[in-house]
């Protein structure tokens, strides 16, 4: 069984210390979320999140506005659940740096700049995990593919 991972390393820069958190979204995380999701939406048949990594910017930028908003909402709901499940809701991180590492299921060529985690960052802000995803609070983003 292939394992797809999207890992986040977060460096929290408080007054005198740096704390590192590693958050991982994999197939097990998606399975847990699907159980929760289908309990909340018993008539739903389709998985809300297809892969444990953010959709490529090439996929969602060409969508019509309603489809893109629906995808964004699904990811926001998923990330809010994920952060709550990790126990980090309303952490309100003031400043941080993030490293996003995406492990794809194939060795097909991927452009690292297409992995922009916009929907995930919006979910982080909405859940209260970070204060906001603006430049004052999110000082640096590093994108990696493996």
Question: Which ranges hold each PLM region?
Answer:
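Catalytic phosphate/metal-binding cores of nucleic-acid and nucleotide-processing enzymes, i.e., regions
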Residues: 2-146
């Amino acid at each position: 069984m292939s394992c797809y991972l999207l890992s986040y390393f977060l460096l929290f820069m408080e007054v005198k210390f740096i704390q590192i958190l590693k958050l991982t979204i994999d197939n097990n995380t998606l399975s847990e979320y699907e159980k929760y999701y289908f309990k909340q939406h018993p008539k739903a048949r389709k998985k809300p999140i297809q892969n444990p990594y953010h959709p490529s910017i090439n996929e969602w930028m060409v969508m019509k506005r309603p489809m893109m908003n629906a995808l964004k909402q699904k990811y926001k709901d998923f990330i809010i659940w994920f952060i709550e499940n990790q126990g980090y809701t309303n952490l309100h991180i003031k400043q941080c740096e993030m490293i996003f590492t995406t492990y794809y299921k194939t060795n097909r060529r991927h452009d690292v700049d297409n992995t922009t985690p916009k929907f995930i960052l919006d979910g982080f802000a909405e859940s209260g995990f970070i204060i906001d995803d603006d430049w004052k609070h999110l000082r640096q983003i590093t994108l990696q593919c493996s």
